[in-house]
Amino acid sequence: MIYFKNFGNSVKNYLILIVCSSLLAGCAFDSKLTAGKLAPKPSEYNGAVIQVYAARTRGAKKLFSVHTWISVKAKNSDDYTSYEIIGWRLRRRDTALVERSNQPDKDWWGHQPELLLDIRGPKAESLIPKVIQAVNNYPHKSNYHAWPGPNSNTFTAFIGRQVPELGLDLPSTAIGKDYREISEIVGMSASGTGVQASLWGLIGISAGLEEGLEINLLGLNFELDLFDLAIELPAIGRIGAADVDVSEITPAFKTNVKNDTASKTETSLK
């Protein structure tokens, strides 16, 4: 009895720590005004662009999870097209998949966006058709569950698996990214650089060059990224080097670019 009491107290204290830390982390990130500053304006950069974003979701879910979406811009195009899953759309339509031309680095219900992936130039141009095909092939357009999935993060992870050249590494706060049907418990990780075993996103393990070693328990992710010297914790997210150094790639922090250049995660703007 004493053992179970101590275990229960430990779990309670850990959950309190997670909630408090996630509140602080969310406030700290939202204090950085990133909306409108992460995507190159079509008038200033004519090359192809692929970007993946995350932002804290709305309501109580924001304590633990982010919402993710993917945006693309074809070479010489004047507009970005964003793709995402929005669950409440199913109340009025037969699909939760949303496709629209808009500002890709918008805020999400007041929460500032975080750039997870940035690919520009010839590589982006070659991958955009594959991304669009993956969007069209997403099997859960009419099926949505906030937890454990399929949800918006399941959608983004699906694109990562279908287009492994993206090298997409979703954060530990992207609850639903590990959702897999019983018929496909084992398969490629979301980054396309490793393998994953997961049962409906409730329990699983992943190992890959981008993810590092990742353990999932009830949708909460613990990740050790040895290559980038970072760790990721449930609700809190990444501690360590960011996946994308926005000071190096975004026109809001760096010189505007007007010509089609090769990219590094994949983007390097000079």
Q: What name fits each language-model region?
A:
Residues 8, 19-20, 261, 266:
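Intrinsically disordered, low-complexity segments
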Residues 28-35, 137-270:
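Activation targets extended, charge/polar-rich intrinsically disordered C-terminal tails
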Residues 30-38, 43-118, 141, 221-236:
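Glycine-rich catalytic cores of cysteine/serine-nucleophile enzymes that process amide/ester linkages
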Residues 14-25:
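Bacterial N-terminal signal peptides
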Residues 103-164:
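Mid-length scaffold segments of soluble, non-membrane domains
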Residues 54-56, 76, 84-89, 113, ...:
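A mature extracytoplasmic/lumenal domain signature
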Residues 1-10:
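N-terminal secretory signal peptides that target proteins for export/translocation
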